[in-house]
Every structure is written in C-alpha cells, then in structure tokens.
Amino acid sequence: METKGKVLVLVSSGHGLPLQEGKVYSGAGYYLNELTVPVRALMKNGYEITFANPKGNTPQLDVNSATAMFFGGDEAKLQDYRSFRDSLTGLKNPARISDVIASGLDQYDAVLVPGGHGPMIDLLDDPDAGTVLRHFHKTSKPTAVLCHGPISLLAALPNASEVVGALKAGDAA
C-alpha cells in the first residue's frame, strides 16, 4: 500500500508519575484507547506511523486504561485494540525524539500526543518534545493532543523548565 504520508506519535518514556507526599503512581503511561483508536484510523487511511519518546524505551500502558469501559463496554473491542497495540512493533521500539529531529521533521505530516498520565511525567518539559511541537506550529502542520496530551504543549514554551518547576513548587507561574 502506498503511504499518504507520515505521522509522528510522541509518547512518554516515564513509568511513574510523582504525586504529593513522595507517592508515585507506578501505573502511569498512555491510555490504550487514546493511542490505538487514532493510530488505527491513521494507518487504515494510509499513513505511516513513527513512535518516539525522550529515551527511546518501550512506553508503558496505563494500567487503568485496559478496560472495556473505554471501548463502550465492549470486551471484544477491548481485546481487538489490545491485539492491534501488540502488533505495533514501532511502539515496542520507539525512536528517541532527538533522533527523529536529527533525521528531519519535514518528513512528517502531523504529530499526535495521546493521553494517559504519561505526558505529565516527562513530555511537559522535554526540550526535544518542545522542538517538535514548535516545528509543527511554525510549519502549520496538524498537531493533535488528546486528554492529558495537551500538557506536552508546555514544552514548546521558551522557558518550559522554569514554568514547570514553578508549577511543581506550587508557585503561580
């Protein structure tokens, strides 16, 4: 099948979301439906998908998202999307965002940041994620951010680390 183009999907490298009082939500990651539903639709319509994250490590599925509740209560649909997810070799071995930048962002037609709590761990102030998001904005290419994915837009700020640091400290950035 001839490809219509390429879509870059940014996912988290993190496997634990820091909470108050030193607690950590260890099940944090991407939400199954927020990643697989749009990725399947894009692939079905002829787009090639590239997964990337800050470390190039396998992203974690948010444990709370693997339930039929997020698929209209349909257990068969949940299993179908789990199987689809398992077939995504690029998700198991994502590129590093820095390597994607080095290979050229102009080859991509759109960027997608699925939700789940993962983006809150590392995409919100990742400098490379910021470079990607600024590039897509400057080139007027589609940027889709789902549920918790919009937190990654903070990375596009020129002072992202400062803003995120202030937020974590409880300051009004």
Where would I find each of the regions flagged by the language model?
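Extended, subdomain-level signal for the structured scaffold at the beginning of enzyme domains
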Residues: 1-139, 152-172
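Conserved, well-structured core segments that form or line functional sites
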Residues: 143
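Short, thiol/selenol-centered motifs that function as redox-active sites or metal-ligating centers
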Residues: 146-150
